Structures are given as structure tokens and as C-alpha cells.
Amino acid sequence: MGTSSAHSAAFHQSQIPNPQSQPLSTTTRSCNRLGILARMSAVLRTLTAPAARQIHRWVLGAFPRGQSTIDYDQPLGDPGIFGPDSVTWRVHSEFPGMLSGGLCALMLQLLHPRALAGVYDQSNFRADLIGRLRRTTNFVAGTTYAPRAEAEQLIARVRSIHSHIHGHTADGMPYDANDPQLLTWVHVTEAYGFLQGCRRYCRDVPAHIADRYYDEARRVAEALGAADVPASEAQVDAYFATVRGQLRMDTRSREVLDILTSIQLPVPAAGLSRGVFLGAGTALLPGWASDMLGRTTTQRAQAHASARLLRSLSPLFRTALRDGLSARACRRMQLPQTMLLEWPGAQ
């Protein structure tokens, strides 16, 4: 891939031209930037090491490794579905944005009666909500960072599982987990949550980068069978406006929300952690969704306080998780992890 090769060559070149004798090339400027970012990251790691170690243990307690058989290290040079030049690799590398955004997506999804019915009727979410969250996390991570063959196997496995999930809602409406429109709903809520989480808690996201993210992310949705998937921020806004008439908050929605908001992660300070991430997730909700969920003024104020706290902690998560799957994918491509700190095409 062109940009990846340029990054790799720039990072490994041993001779940097004298800026007084000739103009800096694009690859040289990229090398200089990555070098500065690497040094800044090293200083930050030193200063924040004790707190970062605690966060590292917290994350591994909530989402332990070893639950997936995917080899993220081989084969060398395999970019997977998205590759290192993608916005997706960068957005999905931000743990605070992904976890809060994923919770935001779940709260949006429970407002759709047909999307909720399959989960409500044909899953064990009541007894194993943590397991369900972990499996979803593994799917998103795998389709983002795994080699292409592994990612495609994940998609095929989910399609096979979906083929057995169908029935009728409490009101008699038919549902099918492979329904292209339901797949689009689930995808859009997730992509919206992840992007907003990244934007609010981790880094600035310019409008053209947001559009590129939505355009990239629909590859997985379409591979699963989704149809008419929005490909830009404006299209996502229009999609939400169109689908809102199908949404409602009912008894089932309330039950699922109560279970979600009482989840107990097997980590230290579980209640505090849950409060921060759930609050930060609800702070990402569109106003109309907060209204439908019946969020009170006090709850909204608490959510904004959680949002401010998570934003302040975001650099620590980045330091703590420098050995995560995004780093392994970068090594597979023989590229420095620091390249993920810049949006593609940054000069």
C-alpha cells in the first residue's frame, strides 16, 4: 500500500537531508514528526507509569487476552480489511472511545423493537452480559486488525449464527438477524458511538476524517449483508432522522437498560468504573435518544461529569495499552505504532 510504504521507508531511513541545503521531502517531514511523537510518548510513559500499570490491569481484568485464537502477528505484510492507512485503525485504537462508544451503541440499539427482539428472545444476555460484550469486542477487534483471512472467517461465522436467529416481536412483527435493514441499524449505532467516543474523549476528528471513517467502516457491515449503509456524517444524521419513527422505549427496552446499567465487571472499583464509562457513553447519545431513554436532568449532569473525567484519563489509557492489538497489527505491517497518532495524510 502506497502510503504505508512511504511511512515505512521514512521511519527506517538512516540519512536525513540537511534542511539548509535542500527542501524537506514529505517522507522526511513524516519521519521527523514520528520521531518527535515517539520521544513525547516515551516521556509520557515514564511520568505516568504507575497509573498506567493500574489501568493496564483494569483493562485486562475486564477484557482478558487469550479468549481469541486469532494470530495478529502473522503473516507479515497482511493489511487485513482496512490496513494502516485507514482512519478505522486510528479510531479503533482509542480504548476510552471504543468502550464508551460501544455502550452508547447498546443504548441506541435497545430502542429498536425488532433489533432488540433477537437479543431478548434468543440470547443469554441476562446471565452473561459480560461474555456478550467480550464477544462483540473480539469481533470488532478482529475485523479491524486481524489478517484478512481471519477477519473474513469472523464475518462468515457471524452470518452463520445470524441465520438461526429469527422470530416475532411481542407485537407480532417478524424479525431476522440477517435482515439487511436491521444489520444497517446495528452497524450505524456502533460506528456512530465509536466515532463520537473518539472525538469527545481521545482526539479531534475533522469533518473529512469522520466522513472517511463512515465510508470505510461500512465494508464490514456490507460483508455481513447490510444494505443502504450511510457513508458520511451527513448520511448518518439523515439515516437517524428516517429511522426514528420505528424506535420506542418499552418494557423490554427498560429491562435491558436496567441490566446494562447494573453490569458488574470483574475489576477493582467495579461500581466506579461502570459509572464513569456508562456516564460517558450516555453523554454521547443524540439528544432525541436521551429524551426517549427518559434521562433526567441530574443523570445528564452526571454523564457530563463522567465525560470530563474520561477525557482527562484518555492519555493514560493510550500509554497503558501500547502493547494492544493495534500495536501488533502495526508490527505485522513493519510500521511504528506512533503512526496511529496522526490522521492519514497529515502533513
Segments (PLM) and residue ranges:
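Mature, function-bearing regions of proteins
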Residues: 33-185, 189-347
